[in-house]
Every structure is written in structure tokens, then in C-alpha cells.
Amino acid sequence: MTVSLQNVTRSVDGIPTIRDVSLTLERGTLSVLLGPTLSGKTSIMRLLAGLDKPATGRVLVDGKDVTGIDVRKRSVAMVYQQFINYPSLTVYENIASPLRVQGKSREEIEKRVQEAARLLKLEPFLKRTPLQLSGGQQQRTAIARALVKGADLVLLDEPLANLDYKLREELRTELPRIFEASGAIFVYATTEPSEALLLGGDTVCMWEGQVLQVGSTPKVYRHPETMRVAQVFSDPPLNIVGIQKHSGSVQYAGGISAPASGLYAGLADGAYRVGFRAHQLEVANGIEGHHAFSATVTVTEITGSESFVHLNRDSSNWVAVLQGIHEYPPGHVLDAALDPNNVFVFDAADRLVAAPIAFSSEVRSGSREENASKKPSAM
């Protein structure tokens, strides 16, 4: 089965929410819609489901135009942020509800509910009602109900957003196994780059109703075609600094000059913008082959395992991530270093012209993105 969007557009109250989007989804694949709030992720899902109609363009299933076909006539299931279950029914009955609507036999219902319960680790809770479950168990019930339906297209709209951190991390690690066990097309919406990396599959990078880049998740992460894609796929935010390349040297905004080594050596003379993620900025002095800076601490966020140090240099705001607990008072001046082989370089049109030479050197041990990308299916 193949589901396609062809040049679809949509507006709400005169405001464009989808701008000329084309997208093809194949059976047995996972596509992660990654973008900030209001980037168009939910709008894309509603078009795929048949809940909304595009103003222009078509929705195709195996080449057949289904743009005007009602959602009830489509093989689609959807899981939302909210825990949408029937409160008066047990977990068993919640999972079984779409099968009863389909008129399945008692034996078939029993078989499929038990299979879904095993897959979602809900077997001990089948006799409970949703109010007797944790948030994670409630969302597992909703996912089980979507899977047991046997839909060809399963849409998950930020399904973990309303869970606490521990439950969210637990389900994140289980979802790839659940997806792999099904032959459906899965579309998963998230605002979090780390979630996209953990899930693997393909990433559809979105911004203001447009699809900016589509590709395997590691490829989009390592080789963003534009600065905007790099920004969407960076958490903490992408650090950016302007440079001027001339002959054998580069001058950073703020007046620091350095040899045009590493990736800079192959650039034509001119102006560029350099992007680097938080784990690419070293808080250290005198690292051989690195370009040295000094920057002023504005705030330090301590998460327990990591410290995010916010820095200001010549009106540029940067973030560095350090392992462990580091407390720097506001106003403290730190030495920082940047590896010229380990940056993204963008031209005047913000198109990528150079990426880190080796991904293995791009991500440091313990960083958010590295931990996520260690999942085998994301490599």
C-alpha cells in the first residue's frame, strides 16, 4: 500500500497551514513529522486521515484519488496527545471496541486483543478501567486499540506529549518494537529531535506548513540541506555565528581571526554562516587545531546528568552542553573552543555547503542527540 499527498494546500481562516506539500508513504515504513508547534504536522495528519480536505491537490491511495472519501471509509487509525479511552469500559473492552464495530467473531476478538495486550504489555491490566491506569498505561491502551483495528495507516499525533518524563522515555524505547511488529504505515508527529532519532525511520522536517527536507533520520540530522532544517533538528537551539573567508584565514563575527583550516579550507572567499550544536562547542582552552573564543555565562541549566551553559558573545547567544553538574554564575567568562572540522557551513542563501567530516567526531559521549542516535535502526 502507498499513500501520497500531491501538491496539497490548506488554509484555516485565511491563514495557510499547508503549503504545496507532496509526500509518499510506503507500507511497513515509519515517517516522523518533525517541526515546532504550528508547523503543519497535525494538518498533514488530518489530510491523510480524511478528516479535512485540501484546498488544492490530491490524496492518493495506491494511485487512486481518495481526496473526498470519508474517514469512516478509510483504513486509518489515529492516536492523539490526550488519553482518549472509554472511561466506563475495561482495558479489554476498549481494545476490543473497533473489532466489535467490524463485526468480528468472539474468537477473533479474543485472539487479537490478547496479541495487542502482549505487544503493549497490558496483560495484567485488561480487567481495569482507564481511571485505574497510569498515564503511560492509558496511552498504551489507546495505541493497542489503534493497532488491533488492523488499519493500513496509523497516525500518532505527539502521543507522548502529555506523559511525565519517565513514562515518556519508557514508551519511546518500546515504540520502535511495536512499529516493527506491524506492517502498517506509521506517521508520528513530534517537536523533539531526540524523539525522531530514537524512533528512526524517515524524518519529514516541517516549518510553517512546508516540507523542508525528507530522508532517513540520520541523514537529515547529519546533513541538513538548509540552516532552517538544522535549527529544527537541534535541541538545544543551533548555535550560529557569521564568518568571512579571505585567502588563508577566516574572521568570525566579533573580530576573532583564525587560520582557514578544516572545513573552511575548501570554501571560496566570501561570507558564510556557521552552525554548531551544543555538544560541538567545547568549554576548554588551548585545544590543538580548534578555534578559541571567550564568552560570558548568562545562565546555567542543570538537569542532573548534564549542564546546559548559555553563553553570550558579541550579541550572539550560544549553548554548550557539559557532562555532570557545573555551576557558573551569570557574568562568568569562559574559554570555549570550536573544531573547524566539526561545524555546519551555510552560504548566503542558508544552503549547506559543508558538514562535519565524521559523524563519530560530531557527537560527544552523553549528549542528548548521541544517546538517541545509538539506537541501531537510526544508524
Label each PLM-derived region with a short phrase.
Residues T42-M45, T141:
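ABC ATPase nucleotide-binding domain helices that frame the ATP-binding cleft
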Residues G57-D65:
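Conserved ABC transporter NBD signature motif
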Residues A49:
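Helix-to-loop junction immediately C-terminal to a conserved catalytic motif
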Residues S249-I357:
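Non-catalytic connector elements of ABC transporters
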Residues A55-R58, E208:
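Conserved coupling/switch loops of ABC nucleotide-binding domains, chiefly the family-specific signature
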Residues S75-A77, Q81, N85-R228:
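ABC ATPase nucleotide-binding domains
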Residues L34-P36:
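The feature captures the beta-strand-to-loop junction immediately N-terminal to the Walker
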